[in-house]
Amino acid sequence: MAKRDYYEVLGVARDVSEQDLKKAYRKVAMKFHPDRNPDDASAEEKFKEASEAYEVLSDKQKRAAYDQFGHAGVEGQGGMGGGAEGFGSFSDIFGDVFGDIFGGAGGGRGRGGPSRGADLRYTLDLSLEDAVRGTSVKIKVPTLVSCTNCGGSGAKPGTTATTCNTCGGHGQVRMQQGFFSVQQTCPTCRGQGKTISDPCNKCHGHGRVEETKTLSVKVPAGVDTGDRIRLAGEGEAGADGGPSGDLYVQVHVKDHEFFQREGRNLYCEVPISIFDACLGGDLEVPTLDGRVKLKVPAETQTGKLFRLRGKGVTPIRGGAAGDLLCRVIVETPVNLSNKQKELLEQLKDTFKGTQHSPKQQSWFEGMKNFFGDMKM
């Protein structure tokens, strides 16, 4: 049975953030965990499926491979093993889920301190030629960078931030509500764990400023629409000295004047005259490497495909290049003179009593049989 899409398994969109991905997995894992569904084979299978999906999507490299190549991109890279032990007991999941809310369910974690910057996405439009051959391009990306004036601290040069007196630097405080000790974001430092009495006049205490960066992107040969190129560390700068996020360049290949691409093969239509179709001849057809000659045999019908081997696309992961398939389209002459029409009438008379249109003859016979079957 074919595997379900991993994003569908966890009920998330393809651009889901790491945090929302984790929340979605916890929700599914808690619902179908074997500890909550003893002797339920269906629930156990769904738990295994969710664990496998989360293992791939929570790993940046595996997720990038899956986004680009689907299940084939992550085959043979291990897995959770399919058992409940792949994540841990239900109590582990429960404690991890509610540890951020209830102080006693896992100790809680402060939110102050360095945090990773957000990932960014950029859509890159490419010509078919550049996508097939590979290229290097410059792109401009608006982002957040560490403030050079304060070194990312947010404090005015010569001063420093101080530990928040309310939360003690944890970024969160606990409040007693009935039987539970509820953990909330510190209202004084807003979760940062520190306060700045004299903020930087450039970043106004944020530690980061907006900037447009110019980046060089090396596009490998063979990319296609939907492929992604990851530039590690080129996303937004992290807060409080945290690591930068990544930039994902999404490839979009523009329509081409002559060619359509399907996988590693290219297709094009080649118009030919009725005379070349009848008598045969040599035609020049375009390829991505220049013009080549195509020999058209006599009595060629419109729509016939001719294959030029090796004139397609070399796959991004290597292997033999695909083919160029040329579909000939026989054109009917237009703007005929009286003399030309007269000559065609004479030619038409020479065809009487003989069969020169096999498809037309079989079509008429089929129509005759069709209407014959409809007799009342």
Swiss-Prot record:
GO terms for molecular function: ATP binding; heat shock protein binding; unfolded protein binding; zinc ion binding. It comes from Teredinibacter turnerae (strain ATCC 39867 / T7901). The J domain is necessary and sufficient to stimulate DnaK ATPase activity. Zinc center 1 plays an important role in the autonomous, DnaK-independent chaperone activity of DnaJ. Zinc center 2 is essential for interaction with DnaK and for DnaJ activity. Residues 5-70 form the J domain. Homodimer. A zinc finger (CR-type) spans 134-212. Gene3D superfamilies: DnaJ domain, Heat shock protein DnaJ, cysteine-rich domain, Urease metallochaperone UreE, N-terminal domain. Participates actively in the response to hyperosmotic and heat shock by preventing the aggregation of stress-denatured proteins and by disaggregating proteins, also in an autonomous, DnaK-independent fashion. Unfolded proteins bind initially to DnaJ; upon interaction with the DnaJ-bound protein, DnaK hydrolyzes its bound ATP, resulting in the formation of a stable complex. GrpE releases ADP from DnaK; ATP binding to DnaK triggers the release of the substrate protein, thus completing the reaction cycle. Keywords: Chaperone, Cytoplasm, DNA replication, Metal-binding, Repeat, Stress response, Zinc, Zinc-finger. PROSITE patterns: DNAJ_1, DNAJ_2, ZF_CR. Zn(2+) 1 binds at residues 147, 150, 200, 203. Binds 2 Zn(2+) ions per monomer. CXXCXGXG motif repeats lie at residues 147-154, 164-171, 186-193, 200-207. Belongs to the DnaJ family. It comes from the Bacteria. This is Chaperone protein DnaJ. Its cofactor is Zn(2+). SUPFAM superfamilies: Chaperone J-domain (SSF46565), DnaJ/Hsp40 cysteine-rich domain (SSF57938), HSP40/DnaJ peptide-binding domain (SSF49493). GO terms for biological process: chaperone cofactor-dependent protein refolding; DNA replication; protein refolding; response to heat.
